[in-house]
């Protein structure tokens, strides 16, 4: 038996969905159940191995849709600038280093290569852009070998992506993706798939699912139909990660489902089980399905996280210390918290605020800190394991107006902040 967990993407600032998957992965490992975590998105900025390891997954746990049809393994990047230099067929006349970007110039050919490093100061290259006569013509993406290449042509003075080519370990071509804006055609040696939906359907059909396997759908946007149609004879489960309906739109005769679950709920007769995080949500869903639909779904409760033990500070908590931990995303409103602490500083000069997490709002928070000259008492701490960190603080702040489950708040409840 294998449990396949279907998701879209994963990032450095992952959501509760990925944390729930990571918790589930730990449970599967502890109980000896074979599980795979499938990611359907294209990853261009980072190596999936790095992102997954950051969440606690092992490389062998991961299946990436786009590499499944190659013989490449999920693995960290080991390709270096020196490796790149050996492969460039021209004389390198100049080198420039600017942060995470190393540029190698070939003056005679009017070509330069921009190597994007995994981390500043390292020699590990994630991708390389080739620019000829001022025009981007190619991007190569690496792990322990070249994974795939993007090809570009200039259109209206902009680089236009028209093709991706995916490689095997020996450099042979596994398949091509022909790109036309948001549409793609996938070309294999023995078949052509005319959309990503067909690509996903083909992938599902190649898993060799049996009646002993389970497919758990964590996110369904753009994938739901293909997964639903190609899961049998395996069992299909759907995870409800958030509030599943709009309370303000409920009447005696109608209900407005959360759009992320509408397809799954409308096809509930094809779902073997739904998973909620709490018994309360399970009870509400059962009542609503009974009232508004002809379906009688099987719904089980599996929490998306747990706390293994009570943790108390070994000494005194840091005086006037404040902590928050979340994705640095707009809906978390960490900027409100930073501004509130700046205001509190006026009457409480000893206050100290540590912000844990990463995300799109990081630059905005840095600007707030700098504008208020708050560098001495507001600190961005990045993504860290906070298991033994929470207990040292006196106060936890949250600016989020809604939570699907609130893993952080669960952790805090046993630390007595």
Task: Describe the role of every protein-language-model region.
Residues 203-209, 243, 252-274:
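Membrane-proximal helix-turn-helix segments that form the acceptor-binding/catalytic region
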Residues 320, 324-343, 360-366:
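A conserved mid-protein helix/loop that constitutes part of the nucleotide-sugar donor-binding site
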Residues 364-383:
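Nucleotide-activated donor-binding/catalytic signature segment of Leloir-type glycosyltransferases, i.e.
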Residues 383-384, 388-393, 398:
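Short alpha-helical donor nucleotide-sugar binding micro-motif in glycosyltransferases
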Residues 401:
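Aromatic "clamp/platform" in nucleotide-sugar-dependent glycosyltransferases that forms part
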Residues 406-409:
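Short glycine/serine-rich donor-binding loops of glycosyltransferases
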